[in-house]
Amino acid sequence: DLTEFQRNMKHFGVENNFPFPFMYYDLQKLYSKVYSDGKTRRSLKMAIEELGFSEDAEYHSAINDAVYTARIFQQMDFDSVKVYESIDTYRIPKDRKTEIYANFGTYEKYISRGFKTRDNAADDRVARSCRCYICGRSMKRLIKWFATTSKTYYSVFVCEEHGTFKGKLKVKHNDNGLYYD
């Protein structure tokens, strides 16, 4: 787990020299896109079983899990999913200038700077605005943002050229006590 790894680095005083933003490939997400519905997350053990690989080592051992992970990556059609990089959020943007905008071809992702309260993060005008991931133009909101949980908000937007889109805003909390979208 990348977050735990970075927490351990911090705890033991090891400098975090990962680039910012730190992009990585999430095996569970990519496996789901190649072998399932794109949403369901499978455990490493389940993926190994589904692919019919021999289970010749214990799970939950860093080296063994790395070997199993490599086997799955070797088997999958990586070219079909390599566009779906994940963005590590252990370190979040420090200010508006370093906020992250990433276009994945079928959706766009935004990671905000940190806010002191959940409400401030949820009310941020940039987070609540939405651009068309196809043409990049600002879209008009058709339905006001509404919450389904204390963390997740939805809205509907329209692009004059490309039609309607669902907007999703998820407020998260980091180890430094800040909230971000």
Locations of regions flagged by a protein language model:
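DEDD superfamily 3′-5′ metal-dependent exonuclease/proofreading module
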Residues: 1-181
